Regions:
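N-terminal "pre-motor" subdomain/linker immediately upstream of P-loop NTPase catalytic cores
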Residues: 1-100
Length: 100
């Protein structure tokens, strides 16, 4: 699943957060309510691929070593800045993206 397509939907729908967790479905927080984006359950591979799309080499290494990394990223295609948190929860990798 392409994380940048989901981020585009996040921007279009004016969502504050995107939740992307292995073993779950992608979700958005819109006006304080968490709503599903899709019905397909994400795999560990989906989350790791998204990590590689969002994080630079050093950030990916920090995640591999500490199982947690936080950073901000500016994506010109959206003309937006996002705060990204990649972590493990109950041994499943997860990503939370905040539209700032």
């Amino acid at each position: 699943m392409d994380i940048k397509k989901l981020m585009q939907e996040m921007v279009t729908r004016d969502a504050s957060d995107l939740f992307f967790r292995a073993g779950g479905i992608p979700r958005l927080r819109i006006d304080g309510k968490v709503v599903p984006m899709d019905t397909r359950v994400l795999s560990i591979e989906d989350v790791m691929f998204a990590t590689e799309q969002l994080a630079n080499t050093k950030q990916c290494e920090v995640f591999r070593n500490k199982l947690d990394v936080d950073f901000a990223v500016y994506l010109a295609e959206f003309n937006r800045r996002f705060r990204v948190s990649i972590f493990t929860q109950r041994n499943w990798p997860s990503i939370v993206i905040r539209n700032v």
